[in-house]
From Swiss-Prot:
InterPro entries: Ribosomal_uL4, Ribosomal_uL4-like, Ribosomal_uL4_dom_sf
Gene Ontology CC annotations of this record: ribonucleoprotein complex; ribosome
Quaternary structure and partners: Part of the 50S ribosomal subunit.
UniProt name for this protein: Large ribosomal subunit protein uL4
Keywords on record: Ribonucleoprotein, Ribosomal protein, RNA-binding, rRNA-binding
Gene it is expressed from: rplD
Origin species: Cupriavidus taiwanensis (strain DSM 17343 / BCRC 17206 / CCUG 44338 / CIP 107171 / LMG 19424 / R1)
Residue ranges of the region described as Disordered: 43-78
Family: Belongs to the universal ribosomal protein uL4 family.
Gene Ontology MF terms in the entry: rRNA binding; structural constituent of ribosome
Function: One of the primary rRNA binding proteins, this protein initially binds near the 5'-end of the 23S rRNA. It is important during the early stages of 50S assembly. It makes multiple contacts with different domains of the 23S rRNA in the assembled 50S subunit and ribosome. Forms part of the polypeptide exit tunnel.
Comp. bias (Basic and acidic residues): 49-58
Compositionally skewed regions (Basic residues) per UniProt: 59-70
């Protein structure tokens, strides 16, 4: 199979040969959903914190005597039953949100994503993607000429000028093949891959 070559003027040129084992697979929506959710879960820092009845700042004085008032008995105002009291099962920073995805499933999911991008025409090959200086305007003008606004660039080796120029653009990311993750691949509208990076992707996912 072939991936379309995108030129600097935004025109689509001749095709570039690509492995159907990586870019020609059927789309497995359930598997893609699983690896994307697992990636997001593993990125969570676990910084949620709520207080239980021991941690809220309340007096330990008994609100009223045990019997004779006609009201329900109460021991402390920090009770979870009271407004402002502690939580019964509070969220804790020690919670573990990680989800395990084995290598075979991850590679199959990534192949499925790359194949779907190829079918939708959202992935293109470029001869090489560089800028002369680490200037955001140079890269922004280049994307404007190509008719692109939301782009993930996968390069065989990270170019410092390209990386620095892309950092101030909100919808642009530059990564190497090993750094490409399922969430970024499905998030960006267009994925640009250098010719050498195509071979690296095929080697990683074979």
């Amino acid at each position: 199979m072939e991936l379309k070559l995108l030129q600097d003027n935004g025109q689509v040129g001749a095709g570039v040969a690509a492995s159907p084992e990586v870019f020609g697979r059927d789309y497995n929506e359930a598997l893609v959903h699983q690896i994307v959710v697992a990636y997001q879960a593993n990125a969570r820092s676990g910084n949620r914190k709520q207080k239980d009845r021991e941690e809220v700042k309340h007096t330990t004085k008994k609100p009223w005597r045990q019997k004779g008032t006609g009201r329900a008995r109460a021991g402390m105002s920090s009770s979870p039953l009271w407004r402002g009291g502690g939580r019964i099962f509070p969220n804790s920073p020690e919670e573990n949100f990680s989800q395990k995805v084995n290598k075979k499933m991850f590679r199959a999911g990534m192949r499925s994503i790359y194949s779907q991008l190829a079918r939708e025409g959202r992935i293109n090959v470029v001869d090489g993607f560089t800028v002369d200086a680490p200037k955001t305007k140079l890269l922004a003008d280049k994307f404007k000429a190509m008719g692109l606004d939301s782009v993930l660039i996968i390069t065989d080796s990270l170019d410092e000028n390209l990386y620095l120029a892309s950092r101030n653009l909100p919808h642009v990311a530059v990564v190497e093949p090993r750094q490409a993750d399922p969430l970024s691949l499905v998030h960006y509208k267009k994925v640009l891959v250098t010719k050498a990076a195509v071979a690296q992707i095929e080697e990683l996912l074979k």
